[in-house]
Structures are given as C-alpha cells and as structure tokens.
C-alpha cells in the first residue's frame, strides 16, 4: 500500500508544569503508514528501513481472564505481525505471531516492540497482559510474554527469553502475579526489558542465559486521588465504582485519603551516562501529572529522574543527549480524551512540548531517525486505525527552566555536556520502543 503523505502543520501549545515547560515554534507531521492493528514499538534497521510491531486483534481460540479477574476474557489468535515501511510502502514481513485481545480487538497483547542489534539481527518482544498462570494452562504453548528472534526470510522465529514465566516463578515486586512486557532495549549482548504487569526491569543475555530482574519499582501512594464517576464505562469493572458506590476503604496502613497505585513501567532507554531510563504509565486511576521517569544505575538502584508527566508510554534519547518522552493521554484515560504529547527534555532540564493533540491520539511508542525526525506510532490502541507519524521541525530551543534544569544537570547534564566538548560527535543511531 503506497501512501500519499498527509502533512499537517501544527502550532504547539505551552503545557504548564513545575519545570516551566515551553513550546516549540512549530512542529509538522506526516502520516507514513496507516491501517495498523494495535501498533506498538518501532525501530530502524541498519539498512535504514523502519519496522513497526502490530499486536493484532487476538482471535477465536482459547481465552484467559483479564488481569483484574473481572470483565471480558482475552482470547487467543495468530493475528500479530511486524510491518516494514520502505519508500512509502508498507509490507507485513512477519505474520502469524501470537495475539491476545478482547472480543472487539482492543486491549491486545502481542508483538509490542522490535529492536535490531549491531549486526542487524532483529528481536521482537511479545506482550501478554494477564496472569501467566493461565497462559500455558489455557492456551497451550505460545510465545506470549516472551522475547523472540525472528527470521523475516522464512517467516519463523525462535524463543530467547520467557519473561512471563519469570514473573510466575519469581514475582520480584511481591504483588499480584501478572506479566505484560511492553518495551526493551539492546545493550551489548543483553536485552533489557520492562514488564508493565510485573512492575520490574529485567535483563537477559542474547544467548538466553541469565534472565534476572534488575529492579522492581515501588507502588505510588496517592493523596486525595480523583476517581472516575460511578458507572463510567471500563473494560476493567473492578477499577470503577458501581452506581451509588464510593471508594471508601483504603488498603491496610493507608489513611482514608490515600490510595496505592501500581507503577506500570512502560518503556526503557539507555542514557548517555550508561544508566537505564524507564518511563511510567501509572496504574488506576491514572493521576494527571503523576507519571515519572526513573533512572536505574548500574547497581540496580532506581531514583526519580523527572516527574510531572501523565501516562507515559515511551522515551528515547537522541545523539545530542536530549530525552524525548511520549504521553499516551494528557488527561486521565477514564476521561475519554486521548490527546497525547511528545515532550523533549534537554540536558539542562528544559522541557519543550513538540506536539500535543491536534491529531496525536493515544500514541504508544517513538523512535528517533537518522534524519533527526521523531517517528511515533499513533492511535496505538485502535485496531485497524493505527498510524506511524513522522514529526519534523523539532529543533527549536526555548529558554531553560530553573528548578528542574538544576536537577537535571546534577543528574547527568554536566557529564554529558563535558563529554560532548571533549569528544568527537557521535554518529547517528536509531533506537525505538512499545
């Protein structure tokens, strides 16, 4: 399918945040692929072509209960795929991948991310989204909840790591057992992945050895959280009070005004300082401004690098040390407004909103091209309506913010700027995510 690029120029707006977020002068985007089914992570191969994962729409096979145990079951099929985008044409070059989804094709677990190593070998992460106890028992042998190594020429693949089974056997965060790996990064001979269901960051060698958790992320304690009105439609009824019911009873040890919510890590990138940076989607009730970016040091200790975001789905560094963060929605998801944002954070802490709404809706992942453009999977939760956008005009630099700028420089900015002054420019690299 050849697409005629539809280019839309958008004046981005200033988004208020404690860091003094600024707006870029203008950003434009073109649609380079559409008609995707639950589009996820995307990545450039060494030959310059762009690849995107499609989680599919499940199928008519066996089913498993949702993570909450309430609501419609998730049913299995082989509708997952990897799609190649080359010279304006899209081609599904890997098909028949496992997929798990609700009856209407939403809420899909399936191919969620793709990466290429230095030799051009691809790896694909397959999501799941339920209790791994039911995976093999209900569905038989599938590659849901695993990292695989595909062969595009033969439309086949081999399993590299079983992340779902690791959660079942180890449960690093000590909470409810669940697995939904969403994104990963290649770091030498290691694959480093986030499991949104297990709330942890894991690593495994490319030869399948030494699968282990690096860190489990803590729950967040919300004070006076805002909940959806009773009766709000939801695929997870346990999250929404029934008619006439109020959320009154906190978990043990919390005051009535407090509520414990899951961290839900969603994406991972390796920073210029060698640490891993992890985006947080947040759990129900998806507090606005409640999402963080964690920094995970070499010793496995995590700290909050930046906060004040809403429902982050991905993040990525460019070759200049700028960090790009992707918001799935600027408001709590239960409000029904899925306008998202792409936010750029400079090494000095400055935040610039490159694009907010205006066609950017429930985006799921991003990557940076060798051309300096940002590529985003858009409408990633809508089967058949998913897109890949190319966002341009992203280089305007606003004045730095104060408080967060000092924090960011203290964290890694000075080291990065010093490195830039005393080394040759890095060659362009392209990495991706969810």
Which stretches of residues belong to each language-model region?
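Beta-rich, blade/repeat-based domains predominating
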Residues: 35-46, 78-79, 100-122, 166-191, ...
